[in-house]
Regions:
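Short, surface-exposed acidic-centric catalytic microdomains
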Residues: 26-72
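Flexible, gly/pro- and Lys/Arg-enriched active-site loops
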Residues: 50-59, 70-77, 81-171
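A structural signal for short, well-ordered beta-strand segments
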Residues: 13, 42, 62-64, 101-105
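Residues at alpha-helix caps and immediate loop-helix transition turns in enzyme cores, especially N-
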Residues: 23-24, 145
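Juxtacatalytic helix/coil linker segments
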Residues: 1-2
Length: 171
């Protein structure tokens, strides 16, 4: 990777269908097969209830810190290919899935990118409300700042409701 083009990124990976841990490990493997992507750190696994439908199977989640020379839209397309390769199908929002990958942060910048008839928002617009993202992210990036709100991750964690924190378990 060329030094000046390298961007630090954070991705959230989750699965609530099939062998969840294997799905996530395989997604990590596929990420690293791209010469324009390198994983630096990986959080532990966190088990959380499915949201908003708690009747769906539980999720396993991790966050990874990486480096990439891919542009934001190319990174988005790359991770969507991985999701499809792992069995993800076009379905309703918040449905169960073998693999879900979200871009949490791309070089501490915010993006709204048109993709077909939709927009991609980076960082993920609800990142600050999600315990299953904030806790693993805090584990590997204690000084991370949320670019949308210019807030430290510790400030975001303080605002998570206690009941939400009780629904997540370190594996």
């Amino acid at each position: 990777m060329l030094e000046k083009q390298v961007k630090k990124i954070y991705l959230a990976l989750g699965s609530n269908l099939g062998n969840k841990k294997v799905n996530i490990e395989y997604a990590k493997f596929l990420l690293q097969q791209n010469k324009k992507f390198k994983i630096l750190k990986t959080s532990n696994f966190y088990k959380t209830k499915s949201w908003p439908n708690y009747k769906n199977p539980f999720f396993l989640n991790i966050v990874i810190e990486g480096l990439t020379t891919l542009k934001p839209l190319d990174l988005f397309k790359f991770i969507k290919q991985i999701e499809v390769k792992l069995g993800r199908k076009k379905s309703s929002k918040n449905s169960s899935r073998e693999c879900d990958i979200d871009i949490l942060d791309y070089d501490q910048k915010t993006f709204k990118i048109k993709n077909n008839n939709d927009f991609i928002h980076i960082p993920h617009p609800r990142l600050h409300q999600r315990n299953f993202v904030l806790l693993p992210l805090f584990e590997i990036a204690k000084n991370w700042i949320y670019p949308n709100k210019n807030k430290k991750i510790t400030d975001l964690l303080i605002n998570i409701e206690t009941n939400d924190l009780r629904t997540i378990k370190l594996i």
